[in-house]
Amino acid sequence: SLFYPQAEEKGLKFNTVSEGMTEELYIGDSLRLRQILLNILSNALKFTPEGGRIQFTIRQMSRGDKDAWLRFTVSDTGIGMSKVFQKHLFESFEQENPNISIKYGGTGLGLAICKNLVTLMGGSINVHSIEGVGSEFCVDVKLGLTEESYRRKNLDLLKFRDLKTLIVDDDIVTCEHASLIMSD
């Protein structure tokens, strides 16, 4: 991951977790999703002091026939933010106070852009934060399933285990081999 070396250099514990994922590939706007997640992870790195922790979690929340809802969560033990500021967090040029801008830099545009991109993707972005404790950002988006996923789901419905198969060949070894393969 792009963030492991940066986290290590800053003395942070960084880990990733994958929960409930049934697919390896999804269809969606990978460029925009990457932009959103990189921004949130960059903020977590920026606002988490040495010795802190950042966790990136991907969870499949639900799955339909042709799409699935995924939740990307970034949680940190950073500086957190006040409840009042959280209401304005996704507005352009917003930073909690001038000292934040001086100490950490930034324009206050990143999360406003993230919010717009997530909305354009038909998803949502939320934050839960406690000042002095840390923050948790959740991005929920619906992504399409690949043809392979769709076929695999439909194959599962056929329940091949209940079917009988006739294997015919003039070579007994070939028949035994085919029988072994089909029994799995």
Describe the residue ranges of each PLM region.
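Disordered, acidic interdomain junction associated with two-component signaling
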Residues: 9, 17, 63, 67, ...
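Glycine-rich ATP-binding loops of the HATPase_c
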Residues: 122-128
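Short helix-loop "hinge" at the ATP-lid/N-box region of the Bergerat-fold HATPase_c
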Residues: 44-45
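Short conserved segment of the HATPase_c
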Residues: 81-95
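Glycine-rich G1-box
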Residues: 5, 79-80
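Short alpha-helical segment within the cytosolic histidine kinase core of two-component systems
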Residues: 1-9, 180
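Short alpha-helical Gxxx[C/S/T] motif in the catalytic ATP-binding
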Residues: 96, 105, 110, 114
